[in-house]
């Protein structure tokens, strides 16, 4: 190869240009690392909430305890209608028409107009959302309209009781599928952590065919609102991957805010979880990616492990992640009883 380059000056110049071009992203990565000599701990609220239910302490007491130990950031998952339904403390119910009609005397549970919608439904995938407060009704309806293109639904509000009946949309999306659309962070959860002085990091879950421009814009606005230091992707796709405009908006937000792209380790710790488009996103944001050590279930279970009396081996995995694999964030999850692990 050396002899060929000596005989062909043009080829040598091309090779040199190629070498220099390859150094540009490398230098960018090195500079990013030099300005990134710290580690951070981000609390996973979902697992902390499960732990609180298994303990004698309240959520507030646990949140205060972690704050006293220096943990001041929390990842809050955006909720779907089904997530809200599964939370007994939130007065929201979501189900398909088929499920709603399974209970005895179901028609008596709804206003006459709403019951008529359900009776006339010809698609078992049509969905109904029922709220027990007007504020919940408005929050959910506004979220659907902000995040889904050309959202259509029949709505009914009487006093504090609201109903949203969702049928097949213009793009063919079934009502049942829309129950999985992430709507935002439930306001009471936001208030809980703001009251305790935590910095909130919104974490959404993308769904194919529901990850367009409106969804990306709404999620980015949420990141801006909370001034999130990290973008933590989760779900089927990279946020906004379904169109170029959305990816441009995400790139612009990250560059303007200085927020880093959180790259979650795989459970075998060999590589990071990736989505199509994430490499380009890193390229276009100055390689501001930070590696995240995720406490997978098998690590959470290393309590009294390797002869230790307590969680020492879990702590050791934190140290190895930071010192050996250059992880900058510990995604802190709780030690749970096996039935909720």
Question: What does each model-found stretch correspond to?
Answer:
Residues 32-341:
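Soluble extramembrane regions of membrane proteins in the secretory/endomembrane system
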Residues 1-6:
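N-terminal Lys/Arg-rich, disordered targeting/topogenic segments
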Residues 9-26:
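Hydrophobic membrane-insertion alpha-helices, especially the h-region
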Residues 29:
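Acidic, glycine-enriched catalytic cores built around paired aspartates
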